Amino acid sequence: MAPKKKGQKMALHEFFEEAATSGTSWADDDFDLPTAPAAREESGSGLKRGDPGYFESLPDRGSRQATFAGAPVQREELPLPTVPPFTAFIGNLSFEPDVEDEVRAFFNDLDPVSVRIVKDPQGKPKGFGYAEFKTQDGLKQALDRSMSQLQGRTIRVNVAEAPSTSRHPPSAAEEASQWRRSTPLASRESSSQPSRRTGGPSEPAADLDWSVARGAKFTPSAPAAPLSGVRRDSSGPGHTREPRDPGVSDTADQWRSNKPLAEKVDRDVPPHQAGVAPPIVSPSLADTEQTWSRGTKLRTPTTTSRQSSADSTPSSGAPQERRKLNLKPRTAGSPSATANATPAAPASGIFGAAKPIDSAAREKAAEEKLAQREGERRKAREEAEKQKAAAGDKPVEGEKLGWREEKLRSIKAAQDKVAGKPTTAPATTTNTGAGRKGSADRAKKDEQGFEQVQPSRKSSQTGATSENKPKKDYSTRPQFSFAAAAGAIRNDLVEDKDEEEVTKGVEEVKI
């Protein structure tokens, strides 16, 4: 084991002095310090962002992008066109509605052909447009006016880019100015380009009259002659397909017929079926139908039933004879025919044996029934009145008058009973208004306003014993008022004819 080396001792200030004089550092050998970015050129205007006119003081986009590192490559200026149209692109225009007139007036001395300002769907300018000039010199002078002021904005004028051209030439539809063509478009096989399906040029197709196809009928052209050099093998590039015979649809003369096209009988058959007669197939319902409009029903052909009936009859060598008719006189009836005749079965309906209801007849029957009941009631009422008249009953008006008279008599009887006078028998005759008299027959009133009782004529004819009796003094002790009793009875509408009940009602009246 080697002996361990001892470190040399040195003062601290000597160590720092040696490191300062050497000028090297271990960090310089391991890391690369980043460099500071290039200083940006200050604009000469001295305006800051946000100040009015700041964006107008900035240089053009091309020069501004080249001032910082990593900027995209500046757009190359387009060369001047040598053939018309000589169009210039005008950018950084104002958004005022009259910007087109201002641009036209700006280039008026250059005699512009047209000025077009691009607008949005709402009709507002987008801030750029195009101006077309007659000559190349006019376009050069327009380019010299770039970075000029127009409506307070610095406009830019450049050469307009030509419209982009695709790899493929424009089609016939793009070049056509009239979209409603009277002849069909040129077929793809007739062009100079090779066909993608066959790999080589093909012969042009026959020119057809397409104007006839717009009518009701389609007139096909004559079948083209078979192509020369057609081989059976059509596979591979450079080979064409074998022409086929015209089908049923090619030879149809009526294209608006509702009936389906009939198939061609002599169509191509497989080799293993060549020379074999086709099977006889009876026509179906669809083959025998003449009308193919929607909603019609297929009718069963009648020829099948006739043929079946003809086949069912046995054939014999001898000719058939007509059966002899047995005629009978017209006067004689045919009982056998009537006996054998069966009644026809009623047609079955969705409602069965139900019949419609005659509402008018039912209403009439109900009215007749009500009228009959009303007549019976009226008749019974008349019979009841007749029975009352026969039994001696009084009419209705007489009954009302008798009730009033009986009421007055009951009141008078009650007054006589209270006064102590004998009651008289009620008269049998009807009152003809004798109860209503003048003011002289009315009862007199005393000092307190009570009516005084006066004896009636019938009570004055009684004996002298009743006249000699002393009269009661009603002024000292008034206890009863006949007028109040009569008023109470009238208000209560007493209809009782019994004298005792009336008297009881009068006695209950108190003053």
Swiss-Prot record:
Gene of this entry: TIF3
Entry GO terms, CC: nucleolus; P-body
Comp. bias regions, Low complexity: 331-349, 420-434
Protein name (Swiss-Prot/TrEMBL): Probable eukaryotic translation initiation factor 4H
Regions of compositional bias (Basic and acidic residues) in chain numbering: 39-51, 230-247, 261-270, 360-388, 394-419, 438-448, 502-511
Function: Probable translation initiation factor.
Compartments, as annotated in UniProt: Cytoplasm, P-body
Keywords: Cytoplasm, Initiation factor, Phosphoprotein, Protein biosynthesis, RNA-binding
Organism per entry: Cryptococcus neoformans var. grubii serotype A (strain H99 / ATCC 208821 / CBS 10515 / FGSC 9487) (Filobasidiella neoformans var. grubii)
Entries under PANTHER family matching the protein: EUKARYOTIC TRANSLATION INITIATION FACTOR 4B/4H, EUKARYOTIC TRANSLATION INITIATION FACTOR 4H
Domain of life: Eukaryota
